[in-house]
Amino acid sequence: MPKESGRKVVATNRKARHDYHVLDTYEAGIALMGTEVKSLREGHASMVDGFCTFYNDELWMEGIHIPEYNQGSWTNHSARRRRKLLLHREELTKISHKIRESGFTIVPLQLYFLDGKAKVEIGVARGKKEYDKRQTLREQQDKREALRVMRERNRG
């Protein structure tokens, strides 16, 4: 079987970009069990409540739901277990220094396969205020309206 090439997105945390200003992004590997990889290859994952924390100078991802593999037996994993993220030591220290500042957090943005290996894109982010969210929605609506007007003008 030939190796996969390219990026196959499994899950995206759309809520993260709505609730946070993402400042920096990093690509990290994930330490997974075999049944988790099989479940991800089927496209099953939810990142809605995901977040990352430091334990013993290691970065862990929590709140990600990867359902049990259908054909798995007693070797199946628990769906919401904590998963270790694999990053270089320099990246870990850089991230830990950033989140020590008040108001910063680490959120998982996207879960994907890159050349056959499971990866997660994490972002160092700061929470948005309610008025920021409303302003973002207003800007998106204005862009949509402008595109609609341009389409109508080009048609006619």
Curated annotation (Swiss-Prot):
It holds the Pfam family SmpB. Its main location: cytoplasm. CDD domains: SmpB. One of its GO terms (molecular function) is RNA binding. It comes from the Bacteria. InterPro entries: SmpB, SsrA-bd_prot, SsrA-bd_prot_CS. It is found in: Cytoplasm. One of its GO terms (cellular component) is cytosol. Residues 131-156 are annotated as: Disordered. Keywords: Cytoplasm, RNA-binding. Belongs to the SmpB family. Required for rescue of stalled ribosomes mediated by trans-translation. Binds to transfer-messenger RNA (tmRNA), required for stable association of tmRNA with ribosomes. tmRNA and SmpB together mimic tRNA shape, replacing the anticodon stem-loop with SmpB. tmRNA is encoded by the ssrA gene; the 2 termini fold to resemble tRNA(Ala) and it encodes a 'tag peptide', a short internal open reading frame. During trans-translation Ala-aminoacylated tmRNA acts like a tRNA, entering the A-site of stalled ribosomes, displacing the stalled mRNA. PANTHER family: SSRA-BINDING PROTEIN, TMRNA-BINDING COMPONENT OF TRANS-TRANSLATION TAGGING COMPLEX. NCBIfam families: PRK05422.1, smpB. This is SsrA-binding protein. It comes from Arthrobacter sp. (strain FB24). The lineage of its organism: Bacteria, Bacillati, Actinomycetota, Actinomycetes, Micrococcales. The gene is smpB.
